[in-house]
From Swiss-Prot:
One of its GO terms (molecular function) is cobalamin 5'-phosphate synthase activity. Keywords: Cell inner membrane, Cell membrane, Cobalamin biosynthesis, Magnesium, Membrane, Transferase, Transmembrane, Transmembrane helix. Its cofactor is Mg(2+). The keyword Protein transport does not apply. It comes from Shewanella woodyi (strain ATCC 51908 / MS32). The chain crosses the membrane at residues 7-27, 39-59, 61-81, 113-133, 143-163, 196-216. The keyword Cell membrane applies. Its EC number is 2.7.8.26. This is Adenosylcobinamide-GDP ribazoletransferase. InterPro entries: CobS.
């Protein structure tokens, strides 16, 4: 029972950190627990994707599919508070508007959104809607699978960067700093097991190719972030999640045609 309660605590901490869903009052959060909660980020993706898929399924019973997709996207934004979208915008602003590493990190930390961030945010949301809408034209039921797989695998991929890259912020004000410390093989194995299980249960014939595509994207993003800022930040993890989610939808659409 103690082990189960401990794992539930870690799951609820991950849920509270990455969503707007409130944690139970008995859950106590500290740096060490948040660090270990990294293992359940994939499950948080499964939760968010499941909520989006449920909203899509309910609304498409009485609304056009395109409108249902918009409601599903809104549900994801409400549940997460636009946490990862904010990271995408900040990353675009930092990498696009800064010359030195220090400038890029300073711009990323600025809460104001710039031109690059606004463009990345608008284009990302538009592309997400278009890809899901095209999937729905081929098979409306496939959108459910896409939402669950996309949200889960993208978070696993984003979290995996922590295990192979250096955290480049040294200020204690960063909310992501505890995630960058003392990661173990256990966290990585649980993350990967979540991805494999969700992909296998989805029954997608192109599941292996999706996994390979995400691995290639991961290498590309690691190279980009290392070249630009020397490692990763919480914002680049958010950007990674968004780009990986879009990549999942794009590959699913390609395999469906």
């Amino acid at each position: 029972m103690h082990v189960l309660r401990q794992q539930l605590t870690l799951f609820f901490i991950a849920m509270g950190f990455f969503t707007r869903i409130p944690m139970p009052t008995w859950v106590k959060v500290d740096g060490e627990s948040l660090n270990k909660a990294n293992r359940y980020f994939g499950l948080i993706g499964l939760l968010v994707g499941g909520i989006c898929a449920l909203v899509y399924e309910i609304t498409r019973g009485f609304l056009p599919v395109s409108v249902s997709i918009i409601f599903a996207m809104i549900a994801g934004l409400v549940v997460t508070g636009g946490f990862h979208e904010d990271g995408l915008a900040d990353t675009a602003d930092g990498l696009g508007g800064g010359w030195s590493v220090a400038d890029k990190l300073k711009i990323m930390k600025d809460s104001r959104i710039g031109t690059y961030g606004a463009l990345a945010l608008v284009m990302g949301l538009m592309l997400k809607f278009i890809l899901l809408s095209e999937l729905a034209l081929y098979n409306p039921d496939l959108v459910v699978t896409a939402l669950i797989v996309g949200h889960t695998l993208s978070r696993v991929m984003a979290a995996s960067l922590i295990f192979s890259q250096s955290y480049v912020r040294d200020d204690d004000s960063s909310k992501s700093k505890p995630l960058a410390q003392n990661q173990t093989v256990n966290e990585l194995l649980i993350l990967l097991a979540t991805a494999v299980l969700v992909l296998w249960c989805s029954g997608l014939s192109g599941g292996l190719y999706i996994a390979i595509g995400l691995v290639l994207l991961r290498w590309g993003l690691i190279y980009l972030f290392h070249r630009q800022i020397g490692g990763y930040t919480g914002d680049t993890l958010g950007a990674t999640q968004q780009l990986a989610e879009l990549a999942c939808y794009l590959m699913l659409l390609g395999f469906s045609l």
